[in-house]
């Protein structure tokens, strides 16, 4: 049973949260939420020395994108993705991410990584290279899926980059918390129920992360998504929205109208899986018109609402164990939710790895607040308000005295945000026993809510005006600066050896997949889709 009201002695949602926080503050219990597992997945466009999208293949010296666990590609062959192993601290996570960037820059042959979420100068849509994963069946599936995304939404939209934060509380939390809550479900069902509650609450509060960390208020005029004509000219080469926090998270970016009718309920794991399963098995007439195989070429994996579950955009995803051999839907059914993936973070342009410690600390504390707060089901009316809030904050989050829709009324953004941050502060104090900066991260959030000029989005616009640069010139300068920074660092001997070995091993594994006996692709695909 999902937790929807107080079950811990409090007589209100706020009372229940306070009761759980007091329990965590008891001697020895704070360790239950410290040192959970976390990881980062960071995308960056690969560009040439002049800032144009690279048309070179993914560098072989980085390994095989299909099989490398840490260095792969996202949508485009020119969109590398840096994936850290799970770590027990944010410092370890960012150090690993930095090491991956050092290793990559040593092998990029003079190319750069674009530092912003909004793209560099792109070629015609059909010339943006789709990621290539070889001729094995798993590789073909990944490439054809991306080809389908291009037909459905356009390739340029898939060139928008971001940071994903993966998080799971310590394993030791679940049995103790289940006992404290006097819950009778199995351990697996309890964990899944609580993490689905976290997902619902994060959906409710995702706007706050967009406000605090959105860093894409402007874009290069060469990038013309639907709706760009509503933006204002900042300079001859730059479009912007004066109060925007994240055009990436707006209806100009990922949250476009193509999935506007699709709602995947997170009110329980069963509802989530059933809704996703329906979307990946229900034909969409618009996509039927594209065709699946046309003149012998695969255009998409199928003509369903979603080709596979990864196509569904959401601010946060419940995720199964990575060790499962099933596709995500099957794994969620069999093993439940193990961790969550936060997907609302823009690239922080001025940080060489795209994200910093303070951001990770705040998001971690926010996730704990979402986990331990009561989490009633989200009904259709509330979902409409959530969607409206998210878009409003993305497009106008820094507008003075902005009010957000909630409970069929409206609340001032700053006031509401400060109330949430006050609740998050209790969890930051729990996490900050060793002076790791969680409390300081919460204080930075307070300052940004009191003064919108202290947000990253405001800083980007301020830099553009102060330096009198177009967005393209500004981002290209940062890309060059970041390259010099990484080339000035040295990997430890062990890490250099490990990453070099992984590159070689991934190439061998990918080549072995291509040599191994395999069924025809159509048969392979039928087997893959049977695992729903």
Q: Predicted segment positions?
A:
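Generic recognition of stable, solvent-exposed alpha-helical segments in well-folded globular domains
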Residues: 39, 95, 99, 136, ...
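A glycine-rich phosphate-binding loop feature that marks nucleotide/adenosyl-phosphate handling sites
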Residues: 119-121, 219-223, 383-394, 438-449
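Terminal catalytic/cofactor-binding subdomain
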Residues: 2-150, 157-163, 190-200, 204-207, ...
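Long, compositionally biased intrinsically disordered regions
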Residues: 123, 406-468
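Loop-rich catalytic cores of soluble enzymes, especially ATP-dependent carboxylate-amine ligases
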Residues: 134-155, 159, 167-331, 352, ...
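Extended, compositionally biased alpha-helical segments that mediate assembly or anchoring
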Residues: 438-532
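Substrate-recognition/cap regions that form aromatic- and gly/pro-loop-enriched pockets
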Residues: 333-334, 340-428
């Amino acid at each position: 049973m999902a937790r929807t009201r107080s079950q811990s002695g409090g007589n209100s949602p706020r009372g229940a949260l306070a009761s759980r926080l007091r329990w965590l503050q008891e001697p020895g219990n704070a360790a239950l939420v410290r040192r959970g597992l976390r990881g980062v997945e960071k995308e960056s466009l690969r560009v040439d020395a002049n800032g144009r999208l690279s048309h070179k293949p993914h560098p072989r010296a980085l390994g095989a994108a299909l099989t490398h666990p840490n260095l792969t590609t996202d949508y485009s062959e020119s969109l590398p993705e840096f994936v850290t192993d799970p770590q027990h601290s944010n410092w370890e996570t960012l150090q690993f991410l930095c090491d991956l960037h050092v290793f990559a820059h040593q092998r990029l042959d003079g190319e750069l990584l674009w530092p912003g979420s909004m793209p560099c100068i792109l070629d015609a849509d059909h010339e943006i290279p789709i990621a290539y994963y070889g001729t094995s069946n798993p590789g073909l599936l990944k490439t054809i899926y991306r080809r389908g995304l291009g037909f459905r939404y356009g390739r340029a939209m898939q060139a928008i980059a971001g940071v994903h934060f993966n998080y799971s509380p310590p394993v030791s939390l679940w049995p103790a918390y289940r006992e404290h809550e006097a819950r009778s479900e199995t351990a697996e069902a309890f964990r899944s129920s609580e993490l689905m509650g976290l997902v619902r609450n994060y959906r409710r509060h995702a706007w706050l992360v967009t406000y605090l960390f959105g860093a894409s208020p402007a874009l290069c005029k060469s990038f013309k998504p639907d709706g760009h004509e509503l933006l204002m000219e900042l300079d001859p080469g730059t479009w912007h929205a004066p109060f925007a926090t994240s055009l990436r998270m707006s209806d100009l970016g990922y949250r476009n109208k193509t999935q506007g009718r699709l709602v995947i309920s997170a009110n329980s794991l069963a509802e989530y899986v059933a809704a996703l399963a329906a979307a990946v098995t229900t034909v969409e007439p618009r996509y039927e018109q594209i065709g699946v195989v046309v003149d012998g070429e695969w255009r998409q994996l199928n003509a369903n609402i979603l080709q596979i579950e990864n196509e569904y955009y959401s601010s946060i995803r419940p995720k199964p164990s990575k060790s499962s051999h099933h596709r995500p839907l099957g794994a969620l059914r069999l093993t439940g939710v193990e961790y969550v993936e936060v997907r609302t973070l823009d690239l922080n342009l001025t940080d060489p790895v795209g994200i910093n410690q303070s951001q990770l600390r705040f998001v971690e504390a926010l996730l704990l607040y979402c986990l331990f707060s009561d989490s009633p089901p989200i009904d259709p009316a509330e979902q409409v308000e959530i969607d409206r809030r998210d878009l409003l904050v993305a497009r106008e989050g820094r507008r003075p005295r902005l009010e957000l829709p909630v409970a069929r009324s409206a609340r001032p953004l700053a006031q509401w945000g400060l109330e949430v941050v006050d609740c998050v502060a209790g969890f930051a104090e729990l996490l900050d026993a060793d002076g790791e900066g969680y409390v300081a991260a919460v204080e930075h959030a307070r300052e940004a809510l009191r003064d919108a000029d202290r947000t990253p989005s405001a800083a980007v616009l301020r830099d553009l005006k102060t330096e009198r640069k177009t967005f393209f010139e500004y981002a290209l300068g940062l890309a060059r600066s970041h390259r010099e920074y990484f080339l000035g660092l040295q990997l430890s001997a062990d890490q250099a050896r490990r990453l070099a070995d992984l590159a070689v091993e991934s190439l061998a594994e990918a080549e072995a997949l291509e040599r191994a006996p395999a069924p025809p692709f159509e048969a392979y695909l039928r087997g893959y889709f049977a695992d729903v």
